[in-house]
């Protein structure tokens, strides 16, 4: 509940802050003097609705979509020792992290990987790949599970949604302002919106969206260090380091699907600025430094 309240409070605070900034600097008056009749408050509300709607809906259906896209087999009735061990381990770690028992699942994938998702820490899903179970020792798997449990306990899914929603709001808002200014000032359109508004708005939204995604990925990399530290506190630092080293040995395995990469423990080899995960060497180094 606290995170939801923070989510709503931040959304409102962002809208109020932008309104104050534009009022203090007389931005709307400046636009009016140049023939740009733009209701910034209405546009801001519109942008927030558009910006947060997709993020919130994605969060609420994240478990359903993860199960569907990865074809996750949820362990409701464990059929073998491995499945029973997985359930016991996650249950113990969830108690240590003071969260509700997540659903536990297995998905078929050659890459040793795992992910956690869900709209709150008491309604989450933790899933591991068959490649993880086949290529790691129990202590290493335990460390990976602890890493994912830490993501849930830290509320990373909600925080990512909050950040994405705020950035989406800025992207939609600024792209519309830029399009409107170009339409009125450069092309002298006096009523409605001409083609320039839509073209410039779309181009601006793409460019600003790319910049926003870099910020989201920066935070995602930061949260991986936190989850590693949390995993180490639950499963032991040496086990966490060993698990990351094992992942490093398997970096050439097939990567996770793009839509799930940000939730996995390892995202494979991607460009640094757009990577959801820090390099494994840096994560290992951070754990070794304590």
UniProtKB/Swiss-Prot annotation:
Name of the protein: Protease HtpX
Entry note: cofactor: Binds 1 zinc ion per subunit.
Short name of one Pfam family: Peptidase_M48
UniProt topology in membrane: Multi-pass membrane protein
Segments passing through the bilayer: 12-32, 42-62, 162-182, 197-217
InterPro entries named in the record: HtpX_protease, Pept_M48_protease_HtpX, Peptidase_M48
Enzyme class: hydrolase
Single GO term (MF): zinc ion binding
Keywords: Cell inner membrane, Cell membrane, Hydrolase, Membrane, Metal-binding, Metalloprotease, Protease, Transmembrane, Transmembrane helix, Zinc
Active site positions: 148
GO biological process: proteolysis
Subcellular compartments: Cell inner membrane
Cofactor(s) listed in the protein's UniProt record: Zn(2+)
Gene symbol of the encoding locus: htpX
A cellular-component GO term for this protein: plasma membrane
Family, similarity comment: Belongs to the peptidase M48B family.
Residues where Zn(2+) binds: 147, 151, 224
CDD domains reported for this sequence: M48B_HtpX_like (cd07335)
EC code: 3.4.24.-
Lineage: Bacteria, Pseudomonadati, Pseudomonadota, Gammaproteobacteria, Alteromonadales
């Amino acid at each position: 509940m606290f995170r939801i309240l923070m989510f709503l409070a931040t959304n409102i605070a962002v809208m109020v802050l932008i309104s104050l900034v534009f009022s203090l600097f007389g931005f709307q008056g400046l636009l009016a003097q140049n023939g740009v009749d733009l209701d910034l408050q209405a546009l801001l509300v519109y942008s927030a609705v558009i910006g947060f709607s997709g993020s919130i809906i994605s969060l609420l259906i994240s478990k359903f979509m993860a199960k569907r896209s990865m074809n996750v087999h949820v362990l409701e009735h464990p059929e073998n020792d491995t499945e029973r061990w997985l359930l016991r381990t996650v249950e113990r770690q969830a108690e240590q992290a003071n969260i509700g028992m997540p659903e536990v699942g297995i998905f078929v994938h050659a890459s040793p990987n795992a992910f956690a998702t869900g709209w709150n820490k008491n309604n989450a899903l933790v899933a591991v790949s068959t490649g993880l179970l086949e290529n790691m020792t129990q202590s290493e798997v335990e460390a990976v599970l602890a890493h994912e449990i830490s993501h849930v306990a830290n509320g990373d899914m909600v925080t990512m949604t909050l950040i994405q929603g705020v950035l989406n709001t800025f992207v939609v808002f600024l792209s519309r302002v830029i399009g409107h200014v170009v339409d009125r000032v450069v092309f002298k359109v006096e009523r409605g919106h001409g083609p320039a508004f839509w073209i410039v708005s779309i181009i601006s939204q793409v460019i600003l969206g790319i910049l926003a995604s870099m910020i989201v990925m920066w935070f995602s990399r930061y949260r991986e260090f936190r989850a590693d530290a949390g995993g180490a506190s639950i499963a032991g630092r040496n086990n966490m380091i060993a698990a990351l080293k094992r992942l490093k040995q398997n970096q050439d395995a097939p990567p996770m699907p793009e839509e799930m990469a940000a939730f996995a423990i390892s995202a494979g080899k991607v460009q640094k600025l757009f990577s959801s995960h820090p390099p494994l060497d840096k994560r290992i180094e951070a754990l070794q430094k304590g």
